[in-house]
Every structure is written in C-alpha cells, then in structure tokens.
Amino acid sequence: MNKKSIRDVDLKGKRVFCRVDFNVPMKEGKITDETRIRAALPTIQYLVEQGAKVILASHLGRPKGQAVEELRLTPVAARLGELLGKDVKKADEAFGPVAQEMVAAMNEGDVLVLENVRFYAGEEKNDAELAKEFAALADIFVNDAFGAAHRAHASTAGIADYLPAVSGLLMEKELEVLGKALSNPERPFTAIIGGAKVKDKIGVIRHLLDKVDNLIIGGGLAYTFVKALGHEIGLSLCEDDKIELAKEFMQLAKEKGVNFYMPVDVVITEEFSETATTKIVGIDSIPSNWEGVDIGPKTREIYADVIKNSKLVVWNGPMGVFEMTPFSQGTKAVGQALADAEGTYSVIGGGDSAAAVEKFGMADKMSHISTGGGASLEFMEGKELPGVVCLNDK
C-alpha cells in the first residue's frame, strides 16, 4: 500500500476530519447491527491517543440531500460514546457556524460527530463548495470509510483537494489485504463468485480470470452458465442476454488454464418459503416448472475440497437464497469449509457473503471480512476507487 496512513503523520493538537462508515441498519431509532461502528474504533482510538481533535463524518441511509429526522446520527454518536467509554459530542450540522463553534471548543482527544453528510445535496454531487466547507473545519483529512470508497463524494474524495489526505487503519487494512490478493496472491488462489446476477459480476469474473487458479460459480448467476452448456433450467434465474458471455468465460478459463467449477447438482423447489418442498437433481435434470435455489450436496463436497486445498480464497456472493433455511445449506457449507480450512487465508467480500457468515456464526473464523460490498467488488474488478486515489502517496 503506497498511500499514507494516520501512522505517517503528526496528529497531536490537529483537527482531523475523519470520514467513517457509520451507515448502520436502524429500526425505530435503535441500531440493529453495530458492526460498522466497531470496525472504526481502532482508528478513532488511535486518533484520540495521539492527541488529535477527532471530527467524525458519515452518511446514514439515503436522505437525498435533505434533513430526515430518523436518519440523524444522534443514536450513533450515543452508542459510539458507550463503546469508547468517553463523552462524544454531536453537532446538528455537518459544517457552518454551529459546527465551527463546536470544533473551536474541542480539546486534544475530544470526539465530535457531525450530522449526516447526505443531508446536503452537494455531498453526492461531490460539490467543491461543500468540500471546502468540510475542509474549513480541519487540518487533516482521514478516510476510513472503505465502504464508501467507490463513491466520488464531497466527504470521501472532494475534501482531499483542500487538505492533506491519509487513510485510517481500517482503510489501510482493506487495501493491504485486497491489494495483496490481486497483485501477489498465495497459491492456489480460488475465487468463489455467487449472487443473483451475472451482470453484477462480469467485471470481477473477467478481472479474476487473469489472477486465479480456481474459479467457483454458484448462486442465481450459475443457471445462466448451466443454460450455456445446453441444459434446461426450468424456472431458474437466467439472463438470456448473457448466455454468450457465459460461454466466452468458460472458454477463457480453459485458455488461461483456470479450473472452472460450477454446480453438478442443485436444490430445486416449486415455491419460495420457509416450509418449501425441495428436491435434489443433477443440473441436466431440472423439471420445467421447478426452480434452482441452491447448490446440491455433491457440489458442496467438490467446492469444499477445492477450498481446503487453497492457500487464498476470495468469496463474493452466496451460493443460494441463504435467507431461507431450506435454501441455505450451500452457502453454509462454503462458509463451513472456509472456517475449517487450515492454512487458508479467507477474504469475504462484504455485502451478502459477509451477512451470511455473520448469520451462521462463522465470522470469527474468517481471516478478513471486508466492510465494503460495492467497494470491494469494484476493487476486485481492478477499478480505481475515488476515495483511495485522492489520498497522499507515501
């Protein structure tokens, strides 16, 4: 990682505008999952210990450029105070006189949470005037919001035009882990790509075919590949306009010497419910009025074996509709194989895969769980992330 981090700069007495990702799920004013707040703690604690004046900025939900009462960061600031064991102040604005006054009153080691940056229309437009307003509050910009690093917004990228810009500890770790996976992976290197749609994963599959030894396919997107092999897939998800692309990917894998794994058997159902009747069939035997919803037991065994014999595994996207118990076994089996694998470094690419390992109680067995769904996806596509490009080089 050739970007400067908070370890590379003097922070004592400095006003630090630290962009974090506190976009946590809320229900009736209560935080239902505080993973993202906890993920930011090491950076915040480091800034506090170094004697910085810590000004935290984040978005929450999609207020679309106006103040929305239930999307204020007040409950987040309160919970952060409990987790840090110290008084955390909350501003009702993200810039301007009120915020400036509160910043002016800060002592070294104090923590202030600004209001939801997406209450302002200029945030998502990366408006230069708004970025200047944010910058006016501080001496240094720290980006620790990997989950929003693929967005060129005023508080994630624009502000870096006006202040020295460095990464926080979470951002640094994400870039280190994902960067090493793509540039200098331990081998055998396996990528597991699941999820519903081929179109969401085209860039990732294309980019990874040049990097991996094994590519494992699962989830709804697998049925487009099954159909590309000439099999009937009943009512399973299929993107007919991507069948040629699926054929191309399978051919590319062959040419590049990549082992390409797709389901050999699947779990099928006639209805989507917790009590659904399911059957297990080979991929060439899906009846016309049934739908594939998970990978079958033979496939799970094959995939687990590949995982066990890999040194590095990157997993992005579930193997089936894991939210429903009858269709969750494939995703669970992949998670279990990663949890049990010895000497395998496992990288979970945020989003649904992270939610799945969390749900099955396997999170602590994974080597690295990315905090950015969209950001880790774009990073794995080989794209430059605006929230990273804007940081100062070492």
UniProtKB/Swiss-Prot annotation:
It catalyses: (2R)-3-phosphoglycerate + ATP = (2R)-3-phospho-glyceroyl phosphate + ADP. InterPro entries: Phosphoglycerate_kinase, Phosphoglycerate_kinase_CS, Phosphoglycerate_kinase_N, Phosphoglycerate_kinase_sf. Keywords: ATP-binding, Cytoplasm, Glycolysis, Kinase, Nucleotide-binding, Phosphoprotein, Transferase. It comes from the Bacteria. GO terms for molecular function: ADP binding; ATP binding; phosphoglycerate kinase activity. The modification Phosphoserine is found at S183. Its main location: cytoplasm. Its EC number is 2.7.2.3. The keyword RNA-binding does not apply. This is Phosphoglycerate kinase. It comes from Bacillus thuringiensis subsp. konkukian (strain 97-27).
